[in-house]
């Protein structure tokens, strides 16, 4: 705990505080929130079809940050020994010793508390269902130890984002189909790009007997599975568009989303481009389609 807290009689220099904040943001990959926040707010606006209150938007943001912090910290803690053996991940904070497990546990607690507080502040309904994503976050890091379907565990975790935004507005399961379609799109999209990301660890996964489509099928066949998943993802998004949105002003953004999914497959060999940059833009394209289409 000494890494996170100092006594009041021993003030910490501002440079040290900034260094630690940078370390914690790097640890949880704070920039990856760009994947989830547009999807959360897509769920919000799809459900409300209007501009919600600033209070609700702020609480949704807080819940998203808390949930993302908890999810990434759980993943890093559960996989720390695997990461220590993987040349690609050995320099991460826990394997390298730049962060201790107690520090990570405190960060996990912080994320869970922030998430729980935000869910409770929105409504008792959202608070009661708030443990569901946490259970998924705990479970999916273990999936690659026994099933190649682990990619769908990652997708399922992020598919909670649009549902969370939907439930923050609706606070019931009534009329869930549009929110469910957005969630299924997210599940398929994320599972597909997780297969692309796993190509970085093809040899390591085989050596460690970890399960993935790439390790079981080989890179080319696994990327074929990824392309099919992204094709189905676009089909689900198109169904959502024609079923619920039906605003031609938003149609160009639907096409942009399809083009980005296609580009992600064409540039799958460049994981930095496909996984990080294209996906960040794609999330905002989906949000833009929903925002423009329902208001």
Where are these regions (language model features)?
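Cytosolic, membrane-interface loops and tails of multi-pass inner-membrane proteins
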Residues: 5-22, 72, 76-99, 194-220, ...
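Membrane-embedded alpha-helical segments that form the functional core of polytopic membrane enzymes
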Residues: 38-80, 88, 109-119, 127-139, ...
